[in-house]
Regions:
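Hydrophobic transmembrane alpha-helices of multi-pass small-molecule transporters
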Residues: 1-69, 183-196, 200-305, 309, ...
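Flexible loop linkers connecting adjacent transmembrane helices
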Residues: 4-9, 45-50, 75-91, 125-135, ...
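Transmembrane-helix boundary/entry motifs in multi-pass membrane transporters
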Residues: 14-15, 51-54, 87-100, 129-134, ...
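Membrane-interface helix termini and inter-helical loops of multi-pass transporters
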Residues: 40-52, 166-178, 262-268, 322-335
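Juxtamembrane transmembrane-helix boundary signature
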Residues: 60-82, 108, 115, 288
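Hydrophobic alpha-helical transmembrane segments of multi-pass integral membrane proteins
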Residues: 90-123, 307-320, 334-373, 377-378
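Alpha-helical transmembrane segments of multi-pass membrane proteins
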Residues: 94-108, 133-154, 161, 173-179, ...
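Membrane-core helix-loop-helix motifs of multi-pass transport proteins
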Residues: 123-213, 403-436
Length: 440
């Protein structure tokens, strides 16, 4: 059954799902029109909101571009390629490859969502190289399906924000410790269930041998060696460019800072620390500054989609927030809930909002001020209410192509190649979330 659903969704998506940029533009227009219809906003005020928000995610967009290029450059270093090859050698058949990539991506995203997105796609590509007969789009989809675990992992935006002093909802619900969210029984159940169950779901998505998609072999070729051999009479400028001493000094500086950071903040990994770790590790493993720069240049081609689309989603987010549309959607689900059904209703409202605002932090700003007072009034579990917002966001990412862009950029594929598999994963993983929110 899962295989039939997967094949149907793949055909449907291939025919109807546009490029992610077109998707973002259509969402912009849809949000604009619905906000005019359901809220007291005027066309002029909506245009102003969109324009005011258009550049609000520049810093975040730069962070995401860096995590792609630094992660790609790190994975293209000889030591990391060797590690990925060793890990990928555990898969002997296409079925084993699919299950291994799903498991690997799920665990990696629990550790850190940025790390998981990048390294999961790198690992999937390595498995495709080593296992003949692999369906390459399915392997990349499996890496992205691992993203289902991120909101309940150590880098989950909403549980970390809810426990941070000064967050937008602290004056309503106080601080909610991670013991009630990340380390709660229901979150451990849901996260472990996703890690264990989803490899078997993706296993059943395997196409028939006759339906395996053939991929351009160029996509699976090994990257060129970025090292450069200098002649004996090389000028001082080139000697400096290929100097290992300079790399070691900068690497030591980065390691010293990271040691101080973790001693002060504990295991508080942010996107900035991930980028710094990727950059320092990549620099050291490529040995020389210019070898690393050549690796970065090869990786930078994959950032175009993110750089163009981030402003559109920033504009959508501000329209959702300032028009009141996001709060209106949240209130609709809250009004039909009781104490027992409140987490599930919050989960579905978050999933719906995620189409327009695919950002954990953005969800907390939009939904938190509505969800937390309602949870208090109904006597619902506050920690579970926080995680319900997070789960809805991470669940609907399977149908929202925005966060697939890093994996697709690394893989050299388009969104239509993987979203049929991802939507199938959405259908079956939803059961795990609902069970976890209902039974605990």
């Amino acid at each position: 059954m899962i295989g039939r659903i997967s094949r149907f969704m793949t055909r449907f998506v291939s025919r109807w799902l546009p490029d992610p940029l077109i998707f973002a533009m259509l969402l912009t227009l849809l949000t604009f029109v619905i906000a005019l219809w359901l809220t007291p906003q005027t066309p002029i005020s909506m245009v102003k909101m969109w324009g005011d928000g258009f550049w609000n995610l520049l810093a975040f967009g730069m962070q995401m571009a860096l995590i792609i290029v630094t992660g790609h450059a790190l994975a293209s270093s000889a030591p990391v390629k060797s590690l990925l090859r060793t890990a990928a050698s555990a898969a002997k058949t296409p079925v084993q490859g699919v299950m291994l990539v799903t498991f690997f991506g799920s665990v990696a995203c629990v550790i850190n969502w940025g790390f998981g997105l990048v390294v999961g796609a790198m690992f999937a590509r390595e498995v495709a190289r080593r296992v003949p007969g692999s369906d390459y789009p399915l392997l990349i989809a499996c890496a992205y399906i691992g993203f289902l675990t991120w909101g309940g992992g150590f880098s989950g935006s909403m549980p970390l924000l809810a426990a941070t002093p000064g967050n937008p909802v602290e004056h309503i619900a106080g601080l909610i410790p991670v013991g009630d969210t990340l380390f709660s029984g229901f979150n451990i159940f849901i996260t472990v269930a996703l890690i264990v169950v989803m490899p078997f779901i993706t296993r059943m998505m395997m196409p028939k041998p006759s339906d395996v998609v053939s991929i351009d072999p160029k996509l699976l070729m090994e990257e060129a060696d970025f090292q450069k051999q200098l002649p004996k009479d090389a000028p001082p400028s080139e000697l400096l460019e290929e100097s290992r001493i300079l790399t070691l000094i900068i690497g030591a500086l980065g390691i010293a800072y990271l040691a101080m950071y973790f001693s002060e903040h504990g295991f508080n990994i942010t996107i900035n620390t991930v980028n710094l770790m990727f950059m320092i590790a990549g620099l050291l493993l490529h040995k020389t500054p210019m070898a690393y720069m050549r690796a970065i240049s090869a990786a930078a081609r994959s950032t175009a989609g993110i750089l163009v689309q981030f402003p559109f989603y920033a504009g959508i987010q501000l329209m959702m927030e300032h028009s009141g549309l996001g709060g209106l959607i949240t209130e609709f689900f809250i009004n039909v809930a009781n104490k027992d059904t409140f987490p599930v209703m919050t989960f579905f409202s978050s999933a719906l909002i995620n189409f327009a605002v695919p950002s954990g932090g953005g969800h907390w700003v939009i939904q938190g001020p509505f969800v937390m007072p309602a949870a208090q009034a109904l006597g619902a579990d506050l920690g579970k209410s926080v995680m319900a917002i997070a789960y809805g966001e991470q669940w609907m990412n399977m149908a929202q192509p925005f966060w697939a862009l890093p994996a697709l950029a690394i893989a050299g594929l388009g969104v239509r190649d993987i979203m049929g598999y991802c939507i199938t994963a959405l259908l079956f993983s939803g059961v795990i979330f609902v069970i976890g929110l209902t039974l605990f």
